């Protein structure tokens, strides 16, 4: 399966002056090389996400093998048909720092919507019961997502990952005290609404992610993405908010560590 050796040595601490936190990404079998390349450009901390039971177990194993890498465990809406059985036990792992990614995807509808809603509801309940953060994936389902959060109680630390909304959706997230994570999508020419949301998002509610290997930012769009590329999105956010890269990196890292 995964040929991972315990890498407790600090990987090349040449790293850049600016230190970034990728929250989240999807690490796999080539995690060691990807993490080394990330460290070389100052991406020193990462959360790797689970999307079903098997991938959550892989995420936990990777987090166990590398310093400053943590995992989430959850059932993505695409996998909702399989239910949440076995998830609760994975959340007991010391490497797991959040429930997710969980949510609703009415764009692809890979699972029936009623099953998506039930599985999302169960994961909100788990996050609340275990006092854990919740990482949300929502696509073409903003109203339904907010309705379920309101019905079940939005967990204290809730993150809307890979945010694709605009200022209106941002306000709905912030009104529920949630944080918002921006990916390489923000660099796409078509993402003017996302950039408008970045401009309005309070720095203390802003997180950064690659969602790698997906969504490589401009100028790398279309390539396989990895955590090292977070600097492109970070620079864009610094430009939009008239901040330095260091200020964005420090704030988003502190936000991720809360």
Predicted regions and their residues:
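Mid-domain alpha/beta scaffold segments of enzyme catalytic cores
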Residues: 3-258
């Amino acid at each position: 399966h995964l040929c991972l050796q315990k890498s407790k040595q600090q990987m090349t601490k040449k790293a850049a002056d600016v230190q970034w936190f990728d929250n989240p990404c999807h690490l796999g079998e080539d995690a060691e090389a990807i993490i080394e390349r990330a460290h070389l450009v100052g991406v020193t901390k990462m959360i790797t996400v689970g999307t079903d039971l098997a991938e959550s177990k892989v995420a936990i194993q990777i987090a166990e093998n590398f310093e400053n890498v943590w995992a989430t465990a959850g059932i993505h809406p695409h996998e909702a048909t399989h239910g949440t059985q076995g998830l609760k036990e994975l959340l007991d792992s010391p490497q797991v720092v959040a429930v997710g990614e969980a949510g609703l995807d009415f764009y692809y509808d890979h699972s029936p919507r009623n099953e998506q809603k039930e599985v999302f509801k169960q994961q909100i309940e788990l996050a609340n019961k275990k006092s854990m953060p919740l990482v949300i994936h929502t696509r073409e389902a903003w109203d339904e997502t907010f309705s379920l959060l309101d019905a079940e109680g939005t967990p204290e630390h809730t993150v809307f990952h890979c945010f694709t909304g605009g200022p209106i959706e941002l306000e709905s997230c912030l009104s529920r005290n949630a944080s918002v994570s921006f990916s390489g999508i923000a660099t796409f020419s078509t993402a003017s609404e996302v950039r408008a949301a970045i401009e309005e998002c309070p720095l203390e509610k802003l997180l950064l992610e690659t969602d790698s290997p997906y969504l490589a930012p401009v100028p790398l769009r279309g390539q396989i993405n990895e955590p090292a590329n977070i600097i492109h999105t970070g620079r864009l956010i610094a430009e939009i908010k008239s901040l330095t890269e260091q200020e964005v990196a420090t704030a988003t890292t502190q936000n991720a560590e809360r």
